[in-house]
């Protein structure tokens, strides 16, 4: 694992006291990290591009909503670890081109895509993943009309400027759009230099993957492969049965498989005599699927963490 310091610590400011409301000034196709709650909460990637970590609490459960733009990696972790509640910040380091967070209580360093502590008091430990999903804002609002959305935190961020010094944030800007369109991947590719090689032809390095882990087992579900399977895949990960849905409007979602045979019906799925919403796991008759604790990330980041064999194949 290659670790390097690329910007000063906290040059990208984490959010410690998030506020929420019902209004979001962005576009309907803007992606948000959605976390269940009463009411559900949405964290727009347009804001997370400039902050990368939001320290929050949901129903008394301290959580960290985390985002690494270079790895396309969205994951929500529990902040209660080792008998204390941790507060996370952005270390300014990358590990295999992935965000390295640090906790302000022990200054231990944590790899964002895996949740593993790579240096410090908790080295070798792994944070607990919380159920979450990444979906377009339009899908979140349609599925959760009672939901709330993170309001603009404001301030300065290194991601807002051209150098290493923080600059005033303009949330109307999208600093990673050009990177997402390039063939290369990783930190150097962000600056237009492709120094890493990708030796697979079956999927691209920045293919979106839904990562599911169960015990020591890990399986990544590439978005186009699930869509190519009529939008639904049912398989086992470790000792747990999983069902993964993917649609054009709602994105990719993973749930515990109840054992039904799902069939695509437009943007929904039919099983056991009723229709199921893939974005929420809710059925028309009131039943609800159990959302799995998953990550959303690019294929290269999943492969960095789990190896080339850790992908579902049709």
At which residue positions do the language-model features occur?
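Mid-to-C-terminal functional-domain signal that highlights helix-capping/loop sites
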Residues: 1-314
């Amino acid at each position: 694992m290659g670790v390097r310091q690329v910007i000063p610590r906290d040059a990208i400011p984490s959010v410690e006291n998030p506020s929420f409301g019902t209004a979001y000034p962005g576009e309907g196709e803007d992606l948000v990290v959605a976390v269940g709650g009463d009411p559900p909460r949405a964290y727009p990637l347009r804001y997370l591009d400039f902050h990368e970590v939001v320290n929050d609490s949901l129903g008394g459960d301290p959580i960290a909503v985390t985002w690494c733009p270079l790895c396309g990696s969205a994951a929500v972790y529990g902040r209660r670890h080792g008998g204390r509640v941790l507060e996370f910040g952005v270390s300014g380091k990358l590990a295999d081109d992935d965000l390295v967070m640090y906790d302000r209580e022990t200054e231990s360093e944590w790899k964002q895509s895996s949740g593993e502590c790579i240096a410090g008091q908790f080295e070798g430990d792994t944070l607990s993943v919380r159920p979450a999903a990444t979906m377009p804002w339009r899908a979140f609002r349609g599925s959760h009309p009672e939901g709330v959305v993170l309001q603009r935190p404001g301030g300065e961020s290194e991601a807002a400027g051209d150098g290493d010094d923080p600059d005033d944030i303009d949330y109307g800007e999208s600093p990673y759009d050009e990177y997402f369109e390039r063939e290369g991947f990783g930190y150097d590719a962000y600056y237009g230099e492709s120094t890493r090689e990708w030796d697979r032809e079956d999927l691209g390095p920045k293919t979106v993957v839904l990562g599911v882990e169960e015990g020591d087992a890990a399986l990544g579900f590439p978005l186009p492969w699930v869509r190519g399977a009529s939008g639904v895949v049912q398989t086992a990960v470790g000792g747990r049965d999983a069902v993964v849905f993917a649609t054009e409007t709602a994105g990719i979602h993973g749930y515990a498989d109840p054992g039904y045979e799902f069939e695509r019906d437009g943007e929904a799925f039919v099983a056991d005599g009723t229709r199921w919403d893939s974005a929420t796991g809710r059925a028309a008759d009131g039943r609800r699927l159990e959302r799995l604790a998953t990550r959303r990330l690019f294929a290269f980041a999943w492969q960095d963490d789990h190896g080339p064999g850790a992908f579902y194949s049709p």
